[in-house]
Amino acid sequence: KDIYDRVEWACVEEATRALAGKKTYDTWQQGFLQILQSLQKDKVFYINVYHSISREYIEQYLYKLTYDLMIGVVEERAAGMSVRAEDKEFIAHFYKYAFVGLTLEWIRGGMKEAPAAIVERVSTVTHGGITNALEACRIGD
């Protein structure tokens, strides 16, 4: 149980620091970068946790952290649009799963790629995607 408590505590502490004030469209890349950098800072710990029975803790931590980041961005981009709450949540979940999947693969591979390179590639691939998804989900327009 002690290892689970340590993992949970470490994750919560890092999450608070990583995302402080970085949940907007203009700052999400910085928030995602800081998540990756915080994982890389304690690389040995997180790789060991990932390969142990407590991997689920890392996954749950990343899902919560990334959803909180993405729902902030989605809500900001949806301002002034008529979009159902469940559609906004779906968009945030979609990006959450993409980001967490990439992050878990990065951990599984030993965290070799630079966090900034990952964020740059994600930013390039997703550019405009949230706004386009919200536009497609608009009600009555």
Q: Whereabouts are the PLM-identified features?
A:
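N-terminal intrinsically disordered, cationic/polar leader segments
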Residues: K1-A10, R55, G128, N132-D141
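Amphipathic alpha-helical segments that line or abut small-molecule/effector binding pockets
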Residues: Y25-V44, H93, G101
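Amphipathic alpha-helical packing segments from all-alpha helical-bundle domains
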Residues: R55-G80, E89-G101, T131
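C-terminal peripheral helix-coil segments that are non-catalytic and often amphipathic
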Residues: E75, E89, K96-Y97, E105-D141
